[in-house]
Amino acid sequence: MKKISLPKIGIRPVIDGRRMGVRESLEEQTMNMAKATAALLTEKLRHACGAAVECVISDTCIAGMAEAAACEEKFSSQNVGLTITVTPCWCYGSETIDMDPTRPKAIWGFNGTERPGAVYLAAALAAHSQKGIPAFSIYGHDVQDADDTSIPADVEEKLLRFARAGLAVASMKGKSYLSLGGVSMGIAGSIVDHNFFESWLGMKVQAVDMTELRRRIDQKIYDEAELEMALAWADKNFRYGEDENNKQYQRNAEQSRAVLRESLLMAMCIRDMMQGNSKLTDIGRVEESLGYNAIAAGFQGQRHWTDQYPNGDTAEAILNSSFDWNGVREPFVVATENDSLNGVAMLMGHQLTGTAQVFADVRTYWSPEAIERVTGHKLDGLAEHGIIHLINSGSAALDGSCKQRDSEGNPTMKPHWEISQQEADACLAATEWCPAIHEYFRGGGYSSRFLTEGGVPFTMTRVNIIKGLGPVLQIAEGWSVELPKDVHDILNKRTNSTWPTTWFAPRLTGKGPFTDVYSVMANWGANHGVLTIGHVGADFITLASMLRIPVCMHNVEETKVYRPSAWAAHGMDIEGQDYRACQNYGPLYKR
C-alpha cells in the first residue's frame, strides 16, 4: 500500500491588493515573511515520527478571493493540515482569511509603523470570530523596522507552539484507536467512547476482540525470523528480578521461556495490528498485513486474558519504549487496561514531543509527616511538601528510567531521533524483569522494574469525560524526585516492589488544586496519568483549545497560556473563557 503522506504547514502571505504602487512596494517584504516563517518551522520542528516538517507557501501573495482560492487549491492537493497567515501591512480581512473550519490557523501581523500589520491582524481576527472559525493571534511585543527580517523571540515561541499543536491535530485526524478487548475491571477509560474520538479528534475506533491476538499467535501470523531475533535480544539484554510468588506458583525454566516467548509475540502482533507488516504477505496473510491504521492502541488484558495467558506488561513496555530488537525507533502508544482516555493523553504527549510516554497509576500521596513516620526521613528540596507515587505493572516506557542524557549531561527522555544505541542499552540495563504476581496475573508474565532518576522536569496529564460536559484535560507540571535508597525501599515494599516507580512532586501555586500536593492527588480525575518529559503544559493547553477540550486543572504560568483570540470574548477569567468557548464552538469535528 502507498504510505499516507504527513501533514504539511501552509504559509499564506497576504497583501494590500491596490496596484499602481501599494502592492508592488510590499510584495518582496510580504513573501520574505512567509519564507522566514517556513525556514524557522522546518529548522526547529520535526514530526513525531522524526521526519522533517515541510511547509507549502502560496504561489503568490493573497490580496483577495481569487488568490485565496488558488492558494486553497494548492494546499488541498498537498495535504496541508494547518495554516499560518503572515503580513506586514493592511489587507482585506474576510476576503483573505483561511475559511477551512477544521484546520488550525494562526495569523502573524508584523508589528511595524510603516504599514499597519496590526490593523489587518485585528480585522482578520474579527472576521474569524464573527464567522465562528477561531484563529490564533501572533503579534510581536516590540515594534520592528520595516527592513528587519528577524523573527523576535516572542513571535518565534508562538509560531512554534502553534505549529507543534497544529501538527498534532493534523496527524491524529483520519487515524484510528485500536481497542484490543473491552472494558478492563470496570475502568471507565476502557469504556471506549466512539463519539469522543470521532467528534473531538477526527479519529475512528477499531474494536477487535482479544481472540484476534490469540489467533495470530496460535496460527503463526507473524514473522518467525523476527521472533528469533527478539528472543536473542531479550537473552542478551534482559536482567531478571526476584520471583515473589509462593513456591507452588513459581515457573521452571521451560515454563518461563514459554512466557517470555509469548510476551514478545504479543508485542510483535499488537504492533502488526496497529501499523501493518508487509512481511505477512510472504506467508499469504495479505489482509492481516494491512493493519488498522492505528496511531494509538489499548489492550484490555485483565482479566479475561491475564487469568490464563501472559499479561501485556512486557509487550506494552517494549512497544511504548523508543527501542527494541530492531534498534532505536519511534515509540508506539499502547494503553494498559485499554484505558483509551489515558491513551489519548499519551498520544498528545508523543505528538507534541516525539518522546516516549510513561503510563502510570496515580497510586499514593505520601505526606512529609507520613514518610517521616514510617522511614524516619525528613523530605527536603523538590519533595519537601510531599510526593505522589506513580507506579503501574504495565506500559511504562523504559525510557522513563531517564538514563538518556541531554546536552548538559542531565537525565532526560529524548525524542527518538536523538537517542543513541548506548542510551537505549543504558535504559535496558537499568530495568529488571520480575515474574508477574500470581494473585494478579494467573497466566504469568513479566513486569518491568526501574526507578526514575530524580530532578527531571515532567508534565503529568489525563483526559476525562464528564457526562453533560464532554472531555476535559488535566495538567500538572512538576519533577521526579530521588529518595535515599533505604527510604525508597521501605516505601516501595509497602505496595508492589516488582513494578516501575516514579516519585513525582508537582509544582505548587498555593491556590485551588495546586494548594498542596494532597490537593493535586485529590483533584486528579482518574486512577491513571501520563508523564511527558519537560514542562510542556503550555503546548497541551494550546492543543486542547484547538480540539475544543477545556482544561479543568493546570499549573502553567498565565503568560504562557496560548489559545485562539476569540476566547477573550468569552469572559474575563481565562479558565472560564476556555469552558465557555469550548462549549460555544463545540468539538472540532462536530458530529
From Swiss-Prot:
User: Can you name one GO molecular function term for this protein?
Assistant: manganese ion binding
The catalytic activity, as recorded, is: L-fucose = L-fuculose
Belongs to which family? Belongs to the L-fucose isomerase family.
Asked if the Swiss-Prot or TrEMBL record annotates the protein with the keyword Membrane, the reply is no
- What is the name listed in the Swiss-Prot or TrEMBL entry for this protein? L-fucose isomerase
Please give the NCBIfam families that the UniProt record associates with this protein: fucI, PRK10991.1
**Which pathway is it part of?**
Carbohydrate degradation; L-fucose degradation; L-lactaldehyde and glycerone phosphate from L-fucose: step 1/3
Q: What EC numbers are recorded for this enzyme?
A: 5.3.1.25
Q: Where does Mn(2+) bind?
A: 337, 361, 528
> What transmembrane ranges does the database entry give?
none
Natural source organism:
Escherichia coli O17:K52:H18 (strain UMN026 / ExPEC)
HAMAP family the UniProt entry points to: Fucose_iso (MF_01254)
Give the subcellular location: Cytoplasm
